[in-house]
Regions:
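AMP-binding/adenylate-forming domain of the ANL superfamily
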Residues: 1-25, 44-45, 63
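AMP-dependent adenylate-forming
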Residues: 11-37, 143-146
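Structural core segment of the AMP-binding/adenylate-forming
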Residues: 83-161
Length: 194
């Protein structure tokens, strides 16, 4: 099988080809043991993210932000977003609050995914300055969510939101309507790259 897939279905096509073979190896936040993820597991997690994004009402080509260091969750989020034809905007893990505010406002971001405590704290502060930002989704369960913060949830709770979409065919409809013109990712730079 030749793999020449649109990003919206790439991981699923690779899972059909490679199934139970290892796709990724990673360490959890603060972990010391390597963990393995098969192509089938990777595909399953990507589908769950896609379903949860649809449950939130993420539209075609809507921009979502990821503010985290590299992690397995980051990959699930990217491919899950592309699975519903959303566009991801990565924010470097040490991005300043001023830069975050500019990007969130300029791109009209409603949802931001955060890695660790520092990223969550910045996102929470910036949320008060950005009227479009509705929800903060946190990868690391050890992050302490601020008291009286109903707009932030942990990634595993976010995934549960998608259960209402499971089996509805909505993700597949988005994937079938994907085009090569879809934006996948927008990278903001400091302007010093030339």
């Amino acid at each position: 099988m030749q793999i020449n897939s649109h990003l919206s279905v790439l991981i699923h096509d690779l899972a059909k080809k490679h199934g139970g073979r290892t796709a990724l190896e990673y360490k959890d936040y603060g972990g010391t043991q390597w963990k393995h993820v098969s192509w089938n597991e990777f595909s399953n997690q990507v589908t769950r993210v896609s379903e949860a994004l649809l449950a939130l009402g993420v539209g075609v080509q809507e921009k979502i932000a990821v503010f985290s260091q590299n992690s397995i969750h980051y990959l699930f989020t990217d491919f899950g977003a592309w699975g519903v034809r959303a566009c991801t905007i990565p924010l470097y893990a040490t991005t300043s609050e001023e830069t975050m505010q500019y990007i969130i406002n300029e791109a009209k971001i409603r949802y931001i995914f955060c890695g660790e405590q520092e990223q969550y704290d910045k996102a929470r502060h910036v949320q008060n300055l950005c009227s479009s930002l509705l929800k903060i989704i946190i990868y690391d369960r050890s992050v302490t969510i601020a008291e009286h913060d109903p707009s932030s949830i942990y990634f595993d709770d976010f995934l549960k939101m998608g259960f209402s979409i499971t089996g509805s065919g909505e993700v597949e409809k988005r994937q079938q309507s994907a085009t090569w013109e879809d934006l996948a990712c927008i990278l903001y730079t400091s302007g010093t790259t030339g």
